């Protein structure tokens, strides 16, 4: 064990005594590596921005106090996320993967995943996959919008498998990191392809996050296609996440999307209010806050962040940190002080503003990758009629203006055409989960404060 690791292990022993089990397990244990520069700065690598920010905001002073206590030389600690780590030049490093740890965040478990109606099916199938890797659903494809728990559920599969079979070789990799590994190796030495393949193939379970990022990376897609087929034919478990159903992936080669669809696809939907409140209660219990957050406050926060659980949890952490810093009881006034800049009170207006209609049309066109003139125009190919009908439906849903007025926004279509389109979308959503997911995703984009 290196001196840096020894120092961190010593600090960990004190942290375990100072903080509760949840805080210790969630924040301090997941540190994956350490390295020290010539100026005595010891950089600690954690899995993501969330962990980095919490430690640096709330605990860094105590950690550096302990470092000074136990180090024989001047030293201070800094926490960074995995994405910030500057790697050694590719030519100087070996392509190695720690399969025992699998790049997994140990806090992402089935026990810490809050289950509700919106994710129940995905959760139960994930448990079956983890219990019988390679046998139940392969590939296992999880889709849903940003911040709804796809990564948590995917890594819970990996952690469960490792807990029950330490010999299993597991790898969690984000699609962009897979691309970077492949491109950087080839840019230095084209003969490294075999080494790349050998390392990625020597696993039992692969967890690939955000597969949609591979869009347009044709060479990487081809390499991933070869890897996919090899693992699949050898009964290795493949788990994939994406922000949309496989059938709606764009600029991904069809031979890949058809393989994704051949397994089991499950979606995680936007959780209902009661579910979001349960998530906040669980999060509050893990924060070691010693502060009471009332049901009314939790309900308010949950109502403001319907579409992104990470943002919702971030708001709760900000609120509790603010109250702790100023030694305040958490009231609605404190909520407004702490979260005012985050919330920016979104006032929804029903003004008949043509720009709002344009925005819906543009977002729908962008989502389905068709041009705005084709969306509004008279082309009858399904590629254009489906997004056109959805745009009509959403304008009616958001503004409840007359069908004739909506028709005027789509090349002067008549009342009955728009009425029929809206009824068809509403009817089809009840039977087609992929369509419902697409509409829900577009609604989220329309409501995003970044697009207002």
From Swiss-Prot:
SMART domains: AAA (SM00382), Bac_DnaA_C (SM00760). GO terms for molecular function: ATP binding; ATP hydrolysis activity; DNA replication origin binding; lipid binding. GO terms for biological process: DNA replication initiation; regulation of DNA replication. It comes from Acholeplasma laidlawii (strain PG-8A). Gene3D superfamilies: 1.10.1750.10, 1.10.8.60, 3.30.300.180, P-loop containing nucleotide triphosphate hydrolases. InterPro entries: AAA+_ATPase (IPR003593), Chromosome_initiator_DnaA (IPR001957), Chromosome_initiator_DnaA-like (IPR020591), Chromosome_initiator_DnaA_CS (IPR018312), DnaA_C (IPR013159), DnaA_dom (IPR013317), DnaA_N_dom (IPR024633), DnaA_N_sf (IPR038454). GO terms for cellular component: cytoplasm; plasma membrane. It holds the Pfam family Bac_DnaA_C. It is found in: Cytoplasm. Domain I is involved in oligomerization and binding regulators, domain II is flexibile and of varying length in different bacteria, domain III forms the AAA+ region, while domain IV binds dsDNA. PROSITE patterns: DNAA. Residues 103-323 are annotated as: Domain III, AAA+ region. The keyword Nucleotide-binding applies. Belongs to the DnaA family. Residues 1-73 are annotated as: Domain I, interacts with DnaA modulators. Residues 73-102 are annotated as: Domain II. NCBIfam families: DnaA. HAMAP family: DnaA_bact. ATP binds at residues 147, 149-151. Residues 324-452 are annotated as: Domain IV, binds dsDNA. Oligomerizes as a right-handed, spiral filament on DNA at oriC. It comes from the Bacteria. This is Chromosomal replication initiator protein DnaA. Plays an essential role in the initiation and regulation of chromosomal replication. ATP-DnaA binds to the origin of replication (oriC) to initiate formation of the DNA replication initiation complex once per cell cycle. Binds the DnaA box (a 9 base pair repeat at the origin) and separates the double-stranded (ds)DNA. Forms a right-handed helical filament on oriC DNA; dsDNA binds to the exterior of the filament while single-stranded (ss)DNA is stabiized in the filament's interior.
């Amino acid at each position: 064990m290196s001196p840096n690791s020894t120092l961190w292990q010593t600090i960990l022993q004190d942290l375990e005594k100072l903080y509760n089990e949840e805080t210790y397990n969630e924040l301090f244990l997941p540190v994956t590596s350490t390295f020290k520069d010539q100026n005595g700065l010891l950089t600690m690598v954690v899995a993501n921005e969330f962990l980095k920010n919490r430690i640096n905001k709330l605990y860094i002073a105590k950690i550096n106090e302990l470092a000074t206590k136990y180090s024989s030389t001047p030293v201070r600690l800094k926490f960074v996320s995995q994405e910030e780590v500057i790697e050694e030049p590719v030519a100087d490093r070996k392509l190695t993967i720690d399969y025992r740890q699998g790049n997994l965040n140990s806090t992402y478990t089935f026990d810490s995943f809050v289950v509700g109606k919106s994710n129940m099916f995905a959760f139960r199938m994930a448990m079956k996959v983890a219990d019988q890797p390679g046998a139940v659903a392969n590939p296992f494809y999880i889709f849903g919008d940003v911040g709804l728990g796809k990564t948590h559920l995917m890594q819970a599969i990996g952690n469960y498998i490792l807990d029950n079979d330490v010999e299993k070789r597991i790898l969690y990799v984000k699609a962009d990191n897979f691309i970077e590994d492949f491109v950087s190796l080839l840019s230095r030495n084209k003969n490294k392809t075999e080494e790349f393949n050998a390392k990625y193939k020597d696993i039992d379970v692969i967890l690939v996050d955000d597969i949609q990022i591979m869009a347009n990376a044709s060479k990487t897609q081809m390499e991933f296609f070869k890897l996919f087929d090899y693992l699949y034919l050898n009964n290795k478990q493949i788990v994939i996440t994406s922000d949309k159903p496989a059938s709606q992936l764009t600029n991904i080669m069809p031979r890949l999307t058809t393989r994704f669809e051949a397994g089991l696809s499950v979606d995680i939907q936007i959780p209902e209010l009661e579910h979001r409140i349960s998530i906040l209660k669980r999060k509050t219990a893990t924060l070691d806050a010693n502060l009471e957050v009332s049901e009314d406050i939790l309900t308010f926060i949950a109502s403001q962040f319907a579409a992104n659980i990470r943002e919702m949890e971030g708001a709760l952490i900000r609120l509790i940190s603010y109250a702790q810093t100023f030694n305040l009881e958490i009231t609605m006034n404190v909520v407004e002080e702490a979260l005012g800049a985050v919330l920016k009170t979104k006032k929804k207006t029903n003004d008949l503003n043509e720009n709002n209609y344009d925005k819906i049309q543009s977002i729908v066109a962008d989502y389905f990758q068709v041009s705005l003139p084709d969306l509004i125009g008279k082309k009858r190919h399904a590629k254009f009629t489906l997004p056109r009908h959805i745009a009509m439906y959403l304008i009616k849903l958001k503004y409840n203006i007359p069908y004739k007025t909506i028709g005027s926004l789509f090349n002067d279509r008549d009342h009955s055409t728009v009425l029929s389109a809206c009824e068809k979308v509403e009817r089809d959503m009840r039977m087609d989960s992929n369509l419902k997911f697409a509409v829900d995703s577009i609604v989220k984009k329309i409501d995003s404060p970044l697009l207002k």
